[in-house]
Amino acid sequence: MVNVVLGSQWGDEGKGKLVDLLVGKYDIVARCAGGNNAGHTIVVNGVKYDFHMLPSGLVNPNCQNLLGNGVVIHVPSFFKELETLEAKGLKNARSRLFVSSRAHLVFDFHQVTDKLRELELSGRSKDGKNIGTTGKGIGPTYSTKASRSGLRVHHLVNDQPGAWEEFVARYKRLLETRRQRYGDFEYDFEAKLAEYKKLREQLKPFVVDSVVFMHNAIEAKKKILVEGANALMLDIDFGTYPYVTSSNTGIGGVLTGLGIPPRTIDEIYGVVKAYTTRVGEGPFPTEQLNENGEKLQTIGAEFGVTTGRKRRCGWLDLVVLKYSTLINGYTSLNITKLDVLDTFKEIPVGISYSIQGKKLDLFPEDLNILGKVEVEYKVLPGWDQDITKITKYEDLPENAKKYLKYIEDFVGVPVEWVGTGPARESMLHKEIK
């Protein structure tokens, strides 16, 4: 059994909380894309665990965890995150964590050039805007992967005669091409090389052939949960390009990032914030640059876990959700942070786009069009009631249930979970047929 948790908007929907809720039922949690450019917090027995790169299945002491071939790995950050989690009391994490030998490596110079590229782009653009990268080197790493010049985990840990010398030569060549492109930026090659010589020994026990790992697990009828990173609207192909990440963050990335066939997928859970947020630049049709947006930002505590940046806030965009559903094929939804809407008398939701009076059939791929669309809203009544202490779906206010029902009917997918507060237990389950 392979079930998948995916973000349906621009990230920060609360995927980690759903994974945390479900993880006790699974034998394996796997990540398939991205790196340490994402982030979420899980609270267990009052202890906060911040996850960026590592699978959040580590909070379950009986669960194995895999970073698949589609993930890009900054090895120093890998160990720093692991050590931070261990210092907070996470037990036997090292024996339950595995890394694909095919995963690509993020180096510090990728991070340096990530920031240089961002400055370059903001200088070129008419409005001074940039992509809004986290500066973690993710984009440049996927770029070297696509150009077939990148280095993978197996290049680093290979013990065969001459393998280390080959790694050094390729590492140096990769650095030189970056310097040719961005100038002679400061980078102590010898010091970094010495660091990686130590890290390779530390990394070796974690490395597996992830294709064999996954297919053995599937054959053994293991219960597997795939933890998506980022979200569909940040997908390199289907998101608001170029204001996207550099990997496939939808269902396609699950298949290619773990090396599994489509027929192995059972359930696909789409995580949806009850309103919409995004970090960084790019069109955002339902954004509220007013008191409503500020209220959503304040009540929702909308700051990025990885960057600390304030998130842009707006009403729920059902055009985005329908588009996301079309591509990812969600079998059920998790609506998160419904409690943030508790004090709104009326709650608009975006239901269609038009431009120059002409209604669009679907989410447009052209950002020049997307930036000019007019949004048609359906205004739904609020419930003006604190729902954070409610423990059963049936006890939600009628207007809250109507809000959820409207979402279900619009996208044609049932809501299975509803987030009603920041606590781990603040998640209501709704039976679906």
UniProtKB/Swiss-Prot annotation:
Origin organism lineage: Eukaryota, Fungi, Dikarya, Ascomycota, Saccharomycotina
GO annotation, cellular component aspect: cytoplasm
PANTHER family in the cross-refs: ADENYLOSUCCINATE SYNTHETASE
Gene3D superfamilies, per the entry: Adenylosuccinate Synthetase, subunit A, domain 1, Adenylosuccinate Synthetase, subunit A, domain 2, Adenylosuccinate Synthetase, subunit A, domain 3
Cross-referenced SMART domains: Adenylsucc_synt
Function recorded in the entry: Plays an important role in the de novo pathway and in the salvage pathway of purine nucleotide biosynthesis. Catalyzes the first committed step in the biosynthesis of AMP from IMP.
Protein's cellular compartments: Cytoplasm
Family per record: Belongs to the adenylosuccinate synthetase family.
Residue numbers binding IMP: D12, E13, G14, K15, N37, A38, G39, H40, T134, R148, N230, T245, R309
Cofactor binding, note field: Binds 1 Mg(2+) ion per subunit.
Protein name: Adenylosuccinate synthetase
Gene Ontology process terms (BP): 'de novo' AMP biosynthetic process; IMP metabolic process
Keywords per UniProt: Cytoplasm, GTP-binding, Ligase, Magnesium, Metal-binding, Nucleotide-binding, Purine biosynthesis
Subunit structure: Homodimer.
Binding site for substrate: V305, T306, T307, G308, R309, K310, R311
Residues that hold GTP according to the record: 11-17, 39-41, 311, 337-339, 419-421
